[in-house]
């Protein structure tokens, strides 16, 4: 079945591939509407549970302390709660004063190298299908602050804890090493007080069209595409490390497998100030994957999916999921926020923002063959101060003063870049 439409590279005629895919999957699934209705009922129960908690003022996001992670005191119940919700907040991941110091050092780094004078505007249109403006993203990767956080013991401990929530061994194969994560350099967000922003519409990353057409994703989502939804486990890593997103040149993609996306707060954050929201239901990806197979979606479309863009989730096609969007709680600088790689997320709009909204994006990307290959490219980019391969080639930092260099790597950093230590 899969060989009739799957492709490791972007099909020349992706709309024809979508039509072929729908024909094959409908034949395989049988009564798609009945399967989708049952899934919708299950998801609706979860949505009601989430919204009841919100109405009572109870926490939806699991919150744990870094001290408990470090001491090995996280309970089985807390682990299960993270797996049920697909997200977590780590309080006190870094001391607040250290995070505020990093924030100031980022500003000093930008000012010293006259970033405002040399900045040429956004280098990509990755979020182009979403209703909203871009958050204030700076294409900076190699500041001391970012790299110190990435190679810190605190980050390594948190990443290992999160990676171990997954099933990473099956059928005699270890899909990844949970205790070493590669450095995945990403950008920073700096959003000043008084900002008015449209935010960012609900979406998922790690492939859009790919989730239907890639052979590896067909294996990842086999139980969704064959209708065995009760057997689908979003926490099983089998075949996820074999996924290679389509190459659409000089835009944003993700060449690594991330167990969790994440960011670390560099400022305190108040509710209602343009914060991250998620749909805290990891299984909602099954709803997203099956929805385009229903009769009301044009035969060559996937509910707004386009090559080289994020996967949009919208009120038009996914109203049940949008209903469950849930904000992160109040944060302090030094707290970190994490969400499963399939989890739908958005950034809320804000008018006249109170306080700063500054973060550095640092995910959990455990060591495996795919991630090691990218880590070697990261090392080469670090040597030159170049933009990493997954991002537009803007290369602002090549001659910047004060940027992080190979000589600044500690043992965690060297291990995370696949260097012999």
Swiss-Prot record:
InterPro entries: Gig2-like, IPNS-like_sf
A Pfam cross-reference name: Gig2-like
Gene3D superfamilies per UniProt: B-lactam Antibiotic, Isopenicillin N Synthase, Chain
Superkingdom of this protein's organism: Bacteria
Protein name per UniProt: Uncharacterized protein YbiU
Organism: Escherichia coli (strain K12)
Gene: ybiU
């Amino acid at each position: 079945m899969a060989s009739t439409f799957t492709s490791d590279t972007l099909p020349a005629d992706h709309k024809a591939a979508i039509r072929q895919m729908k024909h094959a999957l409908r034949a395989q699934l049988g009564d798609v509407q009945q399967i989708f209705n049952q899934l919708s009922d299950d998801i609706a129960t979860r949505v009601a549970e989430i919204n009841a908690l919100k109405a009572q003022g109870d926490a939806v996001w699991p919150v744990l302390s870094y001290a408990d992670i470090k001491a090995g005191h996280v309970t089985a119940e807390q682990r299960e709660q993270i797996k049920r919700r697909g997200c977590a907040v780590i309080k006190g991941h870094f001391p607040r004063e250290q995070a505020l110091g990093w924030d100031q050092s980022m500003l000093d780094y930008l000012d010293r190298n006259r970033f405002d004078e040399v900045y040429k505007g956004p280098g990509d249109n990755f979020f182009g299908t979403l209703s909203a403006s871009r958050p204030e993203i700076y294409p900076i990767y190699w500041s001391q602050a970012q790299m110190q956080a990435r190679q810190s013991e605190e980050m390594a401990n948190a990443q290992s804890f999160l990676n171990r929530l997954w099933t990473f061994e099956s059928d005699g194969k270890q899909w990844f090493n949970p205790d070493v994560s590669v450095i995945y350099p990403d950008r920073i967000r700096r959003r000043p007080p008084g900002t008015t922003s449209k935010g960012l519409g609900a979406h998922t990353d790690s492939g859009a069209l790919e989730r239907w057409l890639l052979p590896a994703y067909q294996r990842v989502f086999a139980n969704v595409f064959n209708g065995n939804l009760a057997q689908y486990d979003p926490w099983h890593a089998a075949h996820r490390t074999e996924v290679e997103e389509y190459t659409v040149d000089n835009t944003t993609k993700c060449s690594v497998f991330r167990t969790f996306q994440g960011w670390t707060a560099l400022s305190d954050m108040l509710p209602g100030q343009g914060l991250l929201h998620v749909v805290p239901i990891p299984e909602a990806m099954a709803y997203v994957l099956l929805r385009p197979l229903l009769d009301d979606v044009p035969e060559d479309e996937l509910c707004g999916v386009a090559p080289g863009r994020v996967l949009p989730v919208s009120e038009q096609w996914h109203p049940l999921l949008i209903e469950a969007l849930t904000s992160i709680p109040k944060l302090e600088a030094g707290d970190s926020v994490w969400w499963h790689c399939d989890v739908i997320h958005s950034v809320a709009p804000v008018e006249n923002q109170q306080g700063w909204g500054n973060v550095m994006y640092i995910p959990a990307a455990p060591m495996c063959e795919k991630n090691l290959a990218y880590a070697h490219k990261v090392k080469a980019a670090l040597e030159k101060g170049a933009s990493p391969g997954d991002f537009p080639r803007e290369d602002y930092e090549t001659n910047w003063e004060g940027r992080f260099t190979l000589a600044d790597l500690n043992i965690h950093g060297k291990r995370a870049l696949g260097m012999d230590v």
